Amino acid sequence: MRTCNRRKILDAIIAIVERDGITAVTFDAVAAETGLTRGGLLYHFPSREALILAAHQHLADQWEAGMEKIAGGKADTVEPAERDAAYIQSCAQMARRVELLMMLESAGEPDLDSLWQGVLDRWSPPVPDDDDPA
């Protein structure tokens, strides 16, 4: 798929979710939003689930890229304090309605949840164990 069409499709999905909610994402809605044909969408995304998965991946990647920009590097290359600060700052700056809706939607779907959880595992501060005396 041409990168510009892929980006156009992902941006359309995000706009639809932001405006109308996740249930409004259909091939017809995405085709109308992008100006692409329904057949063109089906060629690259064989199911609605594939569209949704790609949108989740795109948003999770954007979130991680934002944290990398704030921290000045990837999670495994920066100090824990920089990682924590980037996580907190990005949560405050980047929590749009679409991210919140997509994260909530992923809660019962292991394939979707793992995309967001991977980012969280790399960036979020570890939760102290209640049994830890420190």
Where are the model-predicted features located?
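N-terminal intrinsically disordered/low-complexity leader segments
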Residues: 1-4
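Alpha-helical DNA-contacting segments of helix-turn-helix folds
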Residues: 52-59, 66
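Generic structural signal for hydrophobic core residues of well-folded globular domains
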Residues: 55, 91, 106-107
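Amphipathic alpha-helical packing segments from all-alpha helical-bundle domains
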Residues: 64, 104-133
